[in-house]
Regions:
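Short, conserved glycine- and acidic-residue-centered signature motifs
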Residues: 33, 37
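N-terminal intrinsically disordered, cationic/polar leader segments
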Residues: 1-32, 42, 46-116
């Protein structure tokens, strides 16, 4: 199962995504659920890299994209850029929610603000 866990710390202007696991919907290379989950993580990583290039982050983001274990964490430089970064994370979170809705046996999402 793919588990996508979103985190935020508004007081520190931080947002994060940790994606772990494999869907197992089909054989490697033919697993549309895994491919969908992966492209969402890669899309977020690219957007966060572009935020860094625009000077919107306080520090370089932590981006690790590995098969079965990806982490994307960043800290915005101010409230305005935090709103932009958070919006990007929320769009990606919506994608994972759609995957979990359509493939609940393969994808789970821990959303921003959701109790553990």
């Amino acid at each position: 199962m793919v588990v996508a866990k979103f985190g935020m710390d508004a007081s520190r202007l931080m947002a994060s995504l940790h994606v772990k696991g494999h869907a197992g919907q089909n054989a490697p290379g033919n697993d549309i659920v895994c491919a969908s989950a992966s492209i969402l993580a890669y899309t977020l990583a690219q957007n966060i890299k572009m935020s860094e290039e625009r000077g919107h982050l306080k520090f370089s983001p932590k981006i690790k994209l590995k098969e079965g274990d990806s982490i994307i964490t960043c800290r915005a430089k101010d409230d305005e850029t935090y709103a932009e970064v958070l919006h990007t994370f929320l769009v990606i979170q919506t994608g994972y929610q759609l995957l979990a809705h359509n493939y609940p046996q393969y994808v789970a999402v821990d959303m921003f603000g959701q109790a553990e």
